[in-house]
Amino acid sequence: WKWWPTLYKNLKHFRMTGGEPMMDVNTYKVFQYIIDHPKDDLHLNVTSNMCPPDEKLKAKYFNMAQEICMQEKVEHMMQFVSVDAFGKRAEYIRDGLDFNYMMDNVEEFLDRIPSRNSITFICTYNNLSITSMDKLLEKILELRKRYSKTYQRVWFDVPLLRQPAWQQITMLPESYQAIHEDNIKYMQDNSGEHNGLHIFKDFEIQKMQRNLAYWRENADASTQNKKNFYAFF
Protein backbone atom coordinates (compact mmCIF):
# COMPACT_ATOMS: atom_id res chain seq x y z
CA TRP A 1 0.00 0.00 0.00
CA LYS A 2 2.98 2.35 0.31
CA TRP A 3 3.10 2.90 -3.45
CA TRP A 4 -0.66 3.30 -3.88
CA PRO A 5 -1.00 7.08 -3.24
CA THR A 6 1.76 7.82 -5.75
CA LEU A 7 0.30 5.46 -8.35
CA TYR A 8 -3.24 6.73 -7.80
CA LYS A 9 -2.45 10.26 -8.92
CA ASN A 10 -1.98 9.19 -12.55
CA LEU A 11 -4.19 6.10 -12.57
CA LYS A 12 -6.82 5.97 -15.33
CA HIS A 13 -7.95 2.33 -15.20
CA PHE A 14 -7.91 0.02 -12.20
CA ARG A 15 -9.27 -3.52 -12.24
CA MET A 16 -9.72 -5.99 -9.40
CA THR A 17 -10.18 -9.65 -10.29
CA GLY A 18 -10.46 -12.89 -8.33
CA GLY A 19 -10.51 -14.89 -6.23
CA GLU A 20 -13.60 -13.05 -5.16
CA PRO A 21 -13.09 -9.32 -4.53
CA MET A 22 -16.18 -9.11 -2.31
CA MET A 23 -14.35 -11.38 0.16
CA ASP A 24 -11.04 -9.48 0.08
CA VAL A 25 -10.45 -6.73 2.64
CA ASN A 26 -8.24 -4.91 0.13
CA THR A 27 -11.27 -4.28 -2.08
CA TYR A 28 -12.83 -2.16 0.64
CA LYS A 29 -9.56 -0.37 1.30
CA VAL A 30 -9.49 0.64 -2.37
CA PHE A 31 -13.15 1.68 -2.28
CA GLN A 32 -12.62 3.79 0.84
CA TYR A 33 -9.55 5.43 -0.64
CA ILE A 34 -11.54 6.36 -3.75
CA ILE A 35 -14.36 7.73 -1.60
CA ASP A 36 -11.86 9.85 0.32
CA HIS A 37 -9.94 10.85 -2.82
CA PRO A 38 -12.40 11.26 -5.72
CA LYS A 39 -10.91 10.95 -9.20
CA ASP A 40 -13.22 11.98 -12.03
CA ASP A 41 -11.11 10.35 -14.77
CA LEU A 42 -10.82 6.92 -13.11
CA HIS A 43 -12.43 3.82 -14.61
CA LEU A 44 -12.91 1.29 -11.82
CA ASN A 45 -13.45 -2.35 -12.87
CA VAL A 46 -14.25 -5.25 -10.55
CA THR A 47 -14.80 -8.90 -11.50
CA SER A 48 -17.06 -10.95 -9.23
CA ASN A 49 -19.28 -14.03 -9.22
CA MET A 50 -21.92 -11.74 -7.65
CA CYS A 51 -22.76 -14.58 -5.30
CA PRO A 52 -21.31 -13.60 -1.89
CA PRO A 53 -21.70 -16.15 0.93
CA ASP A 54 -22.52 -13.42 3.44
CA GLU A 55 -25.30 -10.82 3.11
CA LYS A 56 -23.26 -8.42 5.24
CA LEU A 57 -20.46 -8.54 2.68
CA LYS A 58 -22.90 -7.84 -0.12
CA ALA A 59 -24.42 -4.92 1.76
CA LYS A 60 -20.98 -3.43 2.42
CA TYR A 61 -19.93 -3.85 -1.20
CA PHE A 62 -23.15 -2.44 -2.65
CA ASN A 63 -23.24 0.49 -0.22
CA MET A 64 -19.70 1.54 -1.04
CA ALA A 65 -20.20 1.06 -4.80
CA GLN A 66 -23.35 3.15 -4.53
CA GLU A 67 -21.49 5.96 -2.80
CA ILE A 68 -18.67 5.85 -5.35
CA CYS A 69 -21.04 6.05 -8.33
CA MET A 70 -23.86 8.24 -7.06
CA GLN A 71 -21.51 10.80 -5.53
CA GLU A 72 -19.42 10.79 -8.72
CA LYS A 73 -16.18 9.68 -7.13
CA VAL A 74 -15.06 8.07 -10.43
CA GLU A 75 -15.76 8.44 -14.13
CA HIS A 76 -17.30 4.96 -14.37
CA MET A 77 -17.48 1.64 -12.55
CA MET A 78 -17.70 -1.56 -14.59
CA GLN A 79 -18.97 -4.55 -12.66
CA PHE A 80 -17.84 -7.69 -14.45
CA VAL A 81 -19.87 -10.80 -13.63
CA SER A 82 -18.45 -14.26 -14.33
CA VAL A 83 -21.10 -16.64 -15.66
CA ASP A 84 -20.55 -19.21 -18.41
CA ALA A 85 -24.02 -20.61 -19.09
CA PHE A 86 -27.60 -20.25 -17.84
CA GLY A 87 -29.35 -21.65 -14.78
CA LYS A 88 -28.33 -25.05 -13.43
CA ARG A 89 -25.80 -25.49 -16.22
CA ALA A 90 -23.97 -22.37 -15.09
CA GLU A 91 -24.02 -23.70 -11.52
CA TYR A 92 -22.49 -26.98 -12.71
CA ILE A 93 -19.58 -25.13 -14.30
CA ARG A 94 -18.87 -22.84 -11.33
CA ASP A 95 -19.01 -24.65 -8.01
CA GLY A 96 -20.83 -22.59 -5.40
CA LEU A 97 -22.73 -20.44 -7.88
CA ASP A 98 -26.41 -19.86 -7.14
CA PHE A 99 -27.60 -18.60 -10.52
CA ASN A 100 -30.87 -17.04 -9.37
CA TYR A 101 -29.19 -15.34 -6.41
CA MET A 102 -26.46 -14.02 -8.72
CA MET A 103 -29.01 -12.63 -11.17
CA ASP A 104 -31.04 -11.09 -8.34
CA ASN A 105 -27.87 -9.34 -7.18
CA VAL A 106 -27.16 -8.07 -10.69
CA GLU A 107 -30.64 -6.56 -10.89
CA GLU A 108 -30.33 -5.08 -7.39
CA PHE A 109 -27.01 -3.50 -8.38
CA LEU A 110 -28.56 -1.96 -11.49
CA ASP A 111 -31.64 -0.78 -9.58
CA ARG A 112 -29.81 0.69 -6.61
CA ILE A 113 -27.03 2.42 -8.52
CA PRO A 114 -28.60 3.95 -11.65
CA SER A 115 -25.65 6.01 -12.90
CA ARG A 116 -21.92 5.89 -13.63
CA ASN A 117 -21.82 2.10 -13.85
CA SER A 118 -22.49 -0.85 -16.12
CA ILE A 119 -22.57 -4.64 -15.89
CA THR A 120 -20.54 -6.91 -18.18
CA PHE A 121 -21.26 -10.63 -18.17
CA ILE A 122 -18.06 -12.56 -18.89
CA CYS A 123 -18.96 -15.91 -20.42
CA THR A 124 -15.79 -17.97 -20.83
CA TYR A 125 -17.16 -19.84 -23.80
CA ASN A 126 -16.67 -23.59 -23.47
CA ASN A 127 -18.37 -26.83 -24.46
CA LEU A 128 -20.71 -26.64 -21.46
CA SER A 129 -21.90 -23.16 -22.48
CA ILE A 130 -23.42 -24.04 -25.84
CA THR A 131 -26.77 -25.57 -24.94
CA SER A 132 -28.02 -22.78 -22.67
CA MET A 133 -26.45 -19.77 -24.36
CA ASP A 134 -29.79 -18.94 -25.96
CA LYS A 135 -31.38 -18.35 -22.56
CA LEU A 136 -28.45 -16.23 -21.42
CA LEU A 137 -28.73 -14.08 -24.55
CA GLU A 138 -32.46 -13.67 -23.94
CA LYS A 139 -31.77 -12.55 -20.37
CA ILE A 140 -29.16 -10.05 -21.50
CA LEU A 141 -31.61 -8.56 -23.99
CA GLU A 142 -34.30 -8.39 -21.29
CA LEU A 143 -31.92 -6.54 -18.95
CA ARG A 144 -30.91 -4.12 -21.70
CA LYS A 145 -34.53 -3.24 -22.34
CA ARG A 146 -35.17 -2.71 -18.64
CA TYR A 147 -32.05 -0.80 -17.58
CA SER A 148 -30.40 0.84 -20.60
CA LYS A 149 -32.19 4.16 -20.97
CA THR A 150 -29.58 6.80 -21.80
CA TYR A 151 -26.45 4.64 -22.12
CA GLN A 152 -25.64 0.93 -22.33
CA ARG A 153 -25.60 -0.56 -18.83
CA VAL A 154 -25.58 -4.25 -19.77
CA TRP A 155 -22.69 -5.72 -21.76
CA PHE A 156 -21.33 -9.20 -22.33
CA ASP A 157 -18.28 -10.91 -23.77
CA VAL A 158 -17.61 -14.47 -24.94
CA PRO A 159 -13.84 -15.11 -24.78
CA LEU A 160 -13.01 -18.67 -25.79
CA LEU A 161 -11.75 -21.11 -23.21
CA ARG A 162 -8.45 -22.56 -24.49
CA GLN A 163 -7.41 -24.80 -21.60
CA PRO A 164 -8.09 -27.47 -20.56
CA ALA A 165 -8.37 -28.85 -24.10
CA TRP A 166 -11.14 -31.27 -23.15
CA GLN A 167 -13.41 -28.34 -22.24
CA GLN A 168 -12.93 -26.43 -25.50
CA ILE A 169 -15.87 -26.10 -27.89
CA THR A 170 -13.68 -27.67 -30.58
CA MET A 171 -14.13 -31.19 -29.18
CA LEU A 172 -17.93 -31.14 -29.50
CA PRO A 173 -19.65 -33.06 -32.33
CA GLU A 174 -20.27 -31.00 -35.45
CA SER A 175 -24.03 -31.13 -34.82
CA TYR A 176 -23.60 -28.70 -31.90
CA GLN A 177 -22.51 -26.01 -34.33
CA ALA A 178 -26.14 -25.69 -35.40
CA ILE A 179 -27.03 -24.59 -31.86
CA HIS A 180 -24.33 -21.92 -32.01
CA GLU A 181 -25.58 -20.83 -35.44
CA ASP A 182 -29.11 -20.46 -34.04
CA ASN A 183 -27.75 -18.19 -31.32
CA ILE A 184 -26.05 -16.02 -33.93
CA LYS A 185 -29.32 -15.86 -35.87
CA TYR A 186 -31.17 -14.77 -32.72
CA MET A 187 -28.66 -11.98 -32.22
CA GLN A 188 -28.92 -10.90 -35.84
CA ASP A 189 -32.71 -10.84 -35.58
CA ASN A 190 -32.35 -8.51 -32.61
CA SER A 191 -29.81 -6.13 -34.10
CA GLY A 192 -29.97 -3.06 -36.32
CA GLU A 193 -30.03 0.69 -35.81
CA HIS A 194 -33.50 0.95 -34.28
CA ASN A 195 -33.61 1.30 -30.50
CA GLY A 196 -29.84 1.01 -30.33
CA LEU A 197 -29.55 0.36 -26.59
CA HIS A 198 -31.89 -2.63 -26.68
CA ILE A 199 -30.24 -4.71 -29.39
CA PHE A 200 -27.13 -6.77 -30.04
CA LYS A 201 -24.28 -4.81 -31.57
CA ASP A 202 -22.46 -5.85 -34.73
CA PHE A 203 -19.20 -6.40 -32.86
CA GLU A 204 -20.97 -8.73 -30.42
CA ILE A 205 -22.34 -10.79 -33.29
CA GLN A 206 -18.89 -10.84 -34.88
CA LYS A 207 -17.38 -12.28 -31.70
CA MET A 208 -19.82 -15.18 -31.84
CA GLN A 209 -19.06 -15.65 -35.53
CA ARG A 210 -15.31 -15.71 -34.80
CA ASN A 211 -15.88 -18.36 -32.14
CA LEU A 212 -17.73 -20.47 -34.70
CA ALA A 213 -14.97 -19.99 -37.29
CA TYR A 214 -12.35 -21.05 -34.74
CA TRP A 215 -14.44 -24.10 -33.88
CA ARG A 216 -14.70 -25.18 -37.52
CA GLU A 217 -11.01 -24.64 -38.20
CA ASN A 218 -9.78 -26.41 -35.06
CA ALA A 219 -12.26 -29.25 -34.54
CA ASP A 220 -10.49 -31.91 -32.49
CA ALA A 221 -12.61 -34.66 -30.99
CA SER A 222 -9.57 -36.74 -30.07
CA THR A 223 -10.02 -39.90 -28.06
CA GLN A 224 -7.92 -38.53 -25.21
CA ASN A 225 -10.01 -35.36 -24.98
CA LYS A 226 -13.17 -37.45 -24.88
CA LYS A 227 -11.71 -39.61 -22.12
CA ASN A 228 -10.77 -36.54 -20.10
CA PHE A 229 -14.18 -34.96 -20.67
CA TYR A 230 -15.85 -38.12 -19.38
CA ALA A 231 -13.48 -38.40 -16.43
CA PHE A 232 -14.03 -34.84 -15.24
CA PHE A 233 -17.70 -34.36 -16.11
Which residues does each predicted region cover?
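Alpha-helical repeat scaffolds in large eukaryotic proteins
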Residues: 32-35, 66, 107-110, 138-141
